[in-house]
Amino acid sequence: MNDIILTSQKLYKSYHDGTSRVEVLKGVDLAITKGDRIAIIGPSGSGKSTLLHLLGGLDKPTSGLITLGKVDWQKINEKQRCQLRNQQLGFVYQFHHLLPEFTALENVMMPLLLAGMAVKDAEEKAINMLEQVGLKPRLAHKPAQLSGGERQRVAIARALVHQPHCVLADEPTGNLDEATASKVFDLMLELNKKMNTALVIVTHDQRIAERMDRVLVLHEGSLYARE
């Protein structure tokens, strides 16, 4: 039980669409432990990204409990949520969301600087992380000077540079060609194993899902293990 990082209990999320109420999540229970590899699959519009946002404290549930470590997301303010996210979670999206005016190195340094780390220490850690993703020769390049695969590797380095307990990834290879997507995903699995960081991926790609330890299906608001 001590290895549990992130949990949801009886998680509900609904939206109002005009006069009607749309229930996206209906009592979702999930426990994520250290080093987990979890794929979440399901039809488009089933609420996979919504679930990921809730787990990451980027949105609030209609009801239910979400805990990161021993902290209830609902019992802390926005500033505390930001601090907790920066300390314990990493995020990778389909689009890299790198800051275009900054170099690869500066983008990867950003979470460390926001956490109050000294510039020299942040630079050293960021260089090391970029080396691990094979981009040491590209430190000074801005996103526009990098290929799609390279940009996504910078995004992965940024997500992992502070050694989070869990990485939440939403279609991280969705914008890449098949060969590049395979290489990027291989890298994510390698770093997941090396750093013992839990990895939760929302994906439509069955080949990615097949390589994860657990495959969960989100359908009509319910989350269950694929048989």
Curated annotation (Swiss-Prot):
Superkingdom to which the source organism belongs: Bacteria
Gene Ontology MF terms in the entry: ATP binding; ATP hydrolysis activity; transmembrane transporter activity
Record localization: Cell inner membrane
Membrane topology field: Peripheral membrane protein
Major location category of this protein: membrane
EC code(s) of this entry: 7.6.2.-
Gene3D superfamilies per record: P-loop containing nucleotide triphosphate hydrolases (3.40.50.300)
Keyword Transport: yes
NCBIfam families the UniProt entry points to: LolD_lipo_ex (TIGR02211)
Transmembrane region(s): none
Enzyme class: translocase
Alphabetized CDD domains for the sequence: ABC_MJ0796_LolCDE_FtsE
Listed SMART domains: AAA
InterPro entries xrefs: AAA+_ATPase, ABC_transporter-like_ATP-bd, ABC_transporter-like_CS, ABC_transpr_LolD-like, LolD_lipo_ATP-bd, MacB-like_ATP-bd, P-loop_NTPase
Family that this chain belongs to: Belongs to the ABC transporter superfamily. Lipoprotein translocase (TC 3.A.1.125) family.
Record-linked PROSITE patterns: ABC_TRANSPORTER_1, ABC_TRANSPORTER_2, LOLD
Designated name of the protein: Lipoprotein-releasing system ATP-binding protein LolD
Keyword field contains Cell membrane: yes
Gene Ontology cellular component list: plasma membrane
